[in-house]
């Protein structure tokens, strides 16, 4: 299984301006986040500001993660990045650099 970093940011243009409607959206967002954590789909969710944050997922594929975060759109835009473990990335990068240097 791979790990994925999701960076999310609120889309202010689609949020309701009525405070009661905005509260309803926030309650739904937090309930969704709680569900992702409770089921283990997300291993960590955090905030940088009140408008943007991150989540860490462990999943079989990027498209699985995209499916899990789709319900938060259009209120939040997300960027999904696969996390390559240090040793795997180091070995791949050095192997390619050594091949290029040997030419």
What label would you give each PLM region?
Residues 2-103:
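Conserved, structured core segments of small domains
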């Amino acid at each position: 299984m791979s790990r994925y970093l999701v960076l999310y940011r609120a889309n202010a243009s689609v949020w309701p301006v009525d405070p009661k409607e905005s509260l309803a959206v926030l309650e739904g967002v937090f309930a969704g986040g709680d569900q992702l954590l409770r089921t283990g789909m997300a291993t960590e969710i955090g905030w940088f500001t009140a408008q943007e944050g991150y989540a860490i997922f462990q999943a079989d594929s990027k498209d699985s993660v995209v499916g899990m975060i789709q319900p938060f759109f259009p209120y939040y835009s997300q960027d999904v990045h696969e996390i390559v473990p240090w040793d795997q990335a180091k070995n791949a990068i050095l192997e390619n650099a050594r091949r290029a240097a040997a030419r």
